[in-house]
Amino acid sequence: MKIGIPKEIKNNENRVGLSPSGVHALVEQGHTVLVEKDAGLGSFFEDKDYKDAGADIVSEQSSVWDVEMVIKVKEPLEEEYKYFKEGLILFTYLHLANEEKLTQALVDNKVVGIAYETVQLPDRSLPLLTPMSEVAGRMSAQVGSQFLQKFNGGMGILLGGVPGVPKGKVSIIGGGQAGTNAAKIALGLGANVTILDVNPKRLAELDDLFDGRVNTIMSNPLNIENAVKESDLVIGAVLIPGAKAPSLVTEDMIKQMKDGSVIVDIAIDQGGIFETTDKITTHDDPTYVKHGVVHYAVANMPGAVPRTSTIALNNATLPYAQLLASKGYREAFKANHALSLGLNTYKGHVTHKGVAEAFGLEYTSVEDALKED
């Protein structure tokens, strides 16, 4: 199979779809890999590293898209839509429930859109989302602490406190991979940490995991309101695979927070859980202030630590990329049901229910869509 690795063009997106080791693995299987010139520089991979791994380096962006499968990190931007074509396999994070234009472009051009974030194992875990959830979760506590500093617009709080001064209060809404990793870092910084989740079993697991060092609370509107208004830092880490994130924190709740407190919305790429995160920010300009509260709403948080993120992502995605390249998508879906759940668009159909519901589009099951070929 002929595979393309474009250079990411999203603001400060320094990750790359495959590392040189991933390219080497595919070339060893007999596939041809085209890598756009300088695609790996943001992750400190040189063109020579890719060439030594067996890739062909191409200067024209159009050439790297003129392939059978494109492997990326983030969803294509509008200037890349012109490269879409019928039957192209697009393997990347798509987050379509918050991307109506992209969804329509994929449908109109009959692209086979496979989203990392909806590949799901029988135990309901998300193997291609997990590594980036771990990174974003850990980063959320770090950046939250950073923006609590006075010169960054915060109230000037040290999360760990000092003797005689209370610790900062951190509330994390969502106890999945991102929320758990946020709690690990927040605890490491010495904060007073509360996790809210709708699943009592998960709260019990978190209580055991952290040896009772975090407060675990059932997530409901009243508990969220009480936690939010008392917190110095609130981290939103709720995920519904493939669907738009639920709006859990209202504007009235935000108004009750102290001036200079901070919210970090990890779920912003799926629409966000805070009513006041009404715009996506970038690493160049990551925050804005609303009702006195610093809002951090960067959709590609792991792009700030690209070396770690690229290697972690490559470790997870490579086996699926190898399967797609070696068998083609039809046989790959038959061989791996988890991968078939990643199919969001297929030759004019929307094949993920959450995406279809987000925009009032007709939903076609993966099985039915494949039958129409």
From Swiss-Prot:
Annotated Gene3D superfamilies: NAD(P)-binding Rossmann-like Domain
GO CC aspect terms: cytosol; plasma membrane
Disulfides per UniProt: none
Reaction catalyzed: L-alanine + NAD(+) + H2O = pyruvate + NH4(+) + NADH + H(+)
Keyword DNA damage: no
Binding residue positions for substrate: 15, 74
Gene Ontology MF: a single term: nucleotide binding
GO biological process, one term: L-alanine catabolic process
Coiled-coil ranges per UniProt: none
CDD domains: L-AlaDH (cd05305)
Active site: residue positions: 95, 269
Top-level division of the source organism's lineage: Bacteria
EC primary class: oxidoreductase
Complex formation: Homohexamer. Trimer of dimer.
Function: Catalyzes the reversible reductive amination of pyruvate to L-alanine. May play a role in cell wall synthesis as L-alanine is an important constituent of the peptidoglycan layer.
UniProt cross-references to NCBIfam families, sorted A to Z: alaDH (TIGR00518)
Family under the similarity heading: Belongs to the AlaDH/PNT family.
Record-given protein name: Alanine dehydrogenase
Lineage per the UniProt record: Bacteria, Bacillati, Bacillota, Bacilli, Bacillales
Name of the gene: ald
